[in-house]
């Protein structure tokens, strides 16, 4: 989020009520001066509202989720982050999408000792902000 804000983007974090804490963690990792440019909308929007907001975004960065597929349907530039789920089975159906995935193969459900205590698969942890920024830049070129 910090790198995107430094490039002039404002950040909207979407999700359900169960994602509020994760959204706040993301927001709180930002320097205080940048926090006003990151709004945690998790649990605060209806699906219709989220779709409307996503449709107006300059670029979307999303994990493999329902909102990622909505973003793909809006034909907005999209960076789709895949961990243990497979884009072979659930790809974003858009020619304006870049898929980032650090592992090969199909659906991987096995938890590994290198996964975080919060349950984040190591393959998602391995996706760096630099990887995401490179994809965003290529979509904006």
Show which residues each predicted segment covers.
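Short, structured secondary-structure boundary patches
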Residues: 33-38, 86, 100-105
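Glycine-rich, flexible loop/turn motifs
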Residues: 37, 43, 86-89, 96, ...
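Donor-binding and catalytic core of enzymes assembling or modifying cell-surface/extracellular glycoconjugates
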Residues: 1-83
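Gly/Pro- and small hydrophobic-enriched strand-loop and loop-to-helix capping segments
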Residues: 74-102
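Leloir-type glycosyltransferase catalytic cores
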Residues: 94-141
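Non-catalytic, surface-exposed connector residues within folded enzymatic/regulatory domains
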Residues: 35, 72, 91-93, 126
